[in-house]
Curated annotation (Swiss-Prot):
Residues 80-375 form the USP domain. This is Ubiquitin carboxyl-terminal hydrolase 17-like protein 19. It is found in: Nucleus; Endoplasmic reticulum. Residues 484-495 have a biased composition (Low complexity). Belongs to the peptidase C19 family. USP17 subfamily. Deubiquitinating enzyme that removes conjugated ubiquitin from specific proteins to regulate different cellular processes that may include cell proliferation, progression through the cell cycle, apoptosis, cell migration, and the cellular response to viral infection. SUPFAM superfamilies: Cysteine proteinases. It is an enzyme of class 3 (hydrolase). Residues 382-413, 476-530 are annotated as: Disordered. InterPro entries: HABP4_PAIRBP1-bd, Papain-like_cys_pep_sf, Peptidase_C19, Peptidase_C19_UCH, USP_CS, USP_dom. The active site is at C89 (nucleophile), H334 (proton acceptor).
Length: 530
């Protein structure tokens, strides 16, 4: 049977029935419709994964795979802590997870983007390049994140860390497009950011009357997991890909037999990302209540059972970062993260404090966002570091010794690390705002007909989250381990967190705003380091 390929209004159709066209020509997805195929059909199950290379034909490859840095440029040791500028722990926790993402960090340290970027302002890639370079090249220090990293997002109160994370990833993806503003949506999925974090879902509907199959493909940058009925990440993934029966009022209108008939609908991962961002849905959109249950997650995760093809061998990912929310609900708490340095040692990154940790402590957290990288990618980056660096990896016997050597000396945190290059600071004013980003997210939300499981948002936009210092008693159970601090502020100098987390909150733009509720009466002056 001859295969017809048709491009319709931003949509690529692969159709075995030349007289049939999609009823949704304006949607940004690729669809395949076919009847029962013989075993040696060109589109049989054995070759379906290969089709993903053709389901999104591109007019222009924005980031050729051969241009991605292959060797690691990252220092082996852990980098700097981040100063809290007043309810910005959600920013710091997210930035640390991105900083220790090997493919992203290697690209940033190559400085390839800033050498070719022609934008004068609003480039998130330039801003992140400057931040990651400073953070990784200043171990033992505390640096102040650039105001431009949260410009347009931070509003003087604590926001949701996952929203900020994806806001930043989306801004970096858009920064890959200057000069290519007219490219089609398939070309946009060839950007550096999509090659690192992105993949494709496949939603397959099989008509139980004629056995015709319709495949819909949609890109993703993160994966949201419903944990209400799951005790582990693996269980949540199993629920996500569990087939759904469409019958009765929900019967499927088949595009092959043109009848309304019962059908089965299955969501699977069609192509895998180099880096997986798994979001555990801990917060209710309606009440803001937190699901404070322990959800088990492994150090090594095999994603093969959740792929479109399950007979191609293991697809193993290794954990390298965990973003944690500590507290009772979305209305209070504190964000911090755990990251795995290139040397293989885990560290707890809690604003300015950088503390050596163990995998046992890492796996016992009430995780909010999990970061996994393909094992082959991690090993490749680790091997290149071990060949190119002088000091050996930090072993368990070294951890305690180095952690008890006392406080590391440092000057004022704002003056310790090298300043940003002027031309990068000039570019660092972000054009997007939080409200505009949320509007675009609603506009680009996955089509209802694609979803097998509804993925709700994380936090209501008007939620006020109180910072750690006000609710220490509510978080004591989240810090069971007694770890040796590698990086502390001087005991004689009050920390910025202590002076900024109560009373009036300061935005990164330096404008004091009132907090809500019982803090309304407070008008303490705040010191914001410029």
């Amino acid at each position: 049977m001859e295969e017809d390929s048709l491009y319709l209004g931003g949509e690529w159709q692969f159709n075995h029935f030349s007289k049939l066209t999609s009823s949704r020509p304006d949607a940004a997805f690729a669809e395949i419709q076919r009847t029962s195929l013989p075993e040696k059909s060109p589109l049989s199950c054995e070759t379906r994964v290969d089709l993903c290379d053709d389901l999104a034909p591109v007019a222009r490859q924005l980031a050729p795979r051969e241009k991605l840095p292959l060797s690691s440029r990252r220092p082996a040791a852990v980098g700097a802590g981040l100063q809290n500028m007043g309810n910005t722990c959600y920013v710091n926790a997210s930035l640390q997870c991105l900083t220790y993402t090997p493919p992203l960090a290697n690209y940033m340290l190559s400085r390839e983007h800033s050498q070719t970027c022609h934008r004068h302002k609003g480039c998130m890639l330039c801003t992140m390049q400057a931040h990651i370079t400073r953070a990784l090249h200043n171990p033992g220090h505390v640096i102040q994140p650039s105001q431009a990293l949260a410009a347009g997002f931070h509003r003087g109160k604590q926001e949701d860390a996952h929203e900020f994370l994806m806001f930043t990833v989306d801004a970096m993806k858009k920064a890959c497009l200057p000069g290519h503003k007219q490219v089609d949506h398939h070309s946009k999925d060839t950007t550096l950011i999509h090659q690192i974090f992105g993949g494709y879902w496949r939603s397959q509907i099989k008509c139980l009357h004629c056995h015709g199959i319709s495949d819909t493909f949609d890109p993703y940058l993160d994966i949201a997991l419903d944990i209400q009925a799951a005790q582990s990440v693996q269980q949540a993934l199993e629920q996500l890909v569990k087939p759904e029966e469409l019958n009765g009022e929900n019967a499927y209108h088949c595009g092959v037999c043109l009848q309304r008939a019962p059908a089965s609908k299955t969501l699977t991962l069609h192509t895998s990302a180099k880096v997986l961002i798994l979001v555990l849905k801990r917060f209710s959109d309606v009440t803001g209540n937190k699901i404070a249950k322990n959800v088990q997650y492994p150090e090594c995760l095999d994603m093969q059972p959740y792929m479109s093809q399950t007979n191609t061998g293991p697809l193993v990912y290794v954990l390298y970062a965990v973003l944690v929310h500590a507290g009772w609900s979305c209305h209070n708490g504190h964000y911090f993260s755990y990251v795995k340095a290139q040397e293989g040692q885990w560290y707890k990154m809690d604003d300015a404090e950088v503390t050596a940790s163990s995998i046992t402590s890492v796996l016992s957290q009430q995780a909010y966002v999990l970061f996994y990288i393909q094992k082959s990618e991690w090993e490749r980056h680790s091997e290149s570091v071990s060949r190119g660096r002088e000091p050996r990896a930090l072993g368990a016997e070294d951890t305690d010794r180095r952690a008890t050597q006392g406080e590391l000396k440092r000057d004022h945190p704002c003056l310790q690390a090298p300043e940003l290059d002027e031309h990068l600071v000039e570019r660092a004013t972000q054009e997007s705002t939080l409200d505009h980003w949320k509007f675009l997210q609603e506009q680009n939300k996955t089509k209802p007909e694609f979803n097998v499981r509804k993925v709700e948002g994380t936090l209501p936009p008007d939620v006020l989250v109180i910072h750690q210092s006000k609710y220490k008693c509510g978080m004591k159970n989240h810090h069971p381990e007694q770890q040796s601090s590698l990086l502390k502020l001087s005991s004689t100098t009050p920390t910025h967190q202590e002076s900024m987390n109560t009373g009036t909150l300061a935005s990164l733009r330096g404008r004091a705003r009132r907090s809500k509720g019982k803090n309304k009466h407070s008008k303490r002056a705040l010191l914001v380091c410029q």
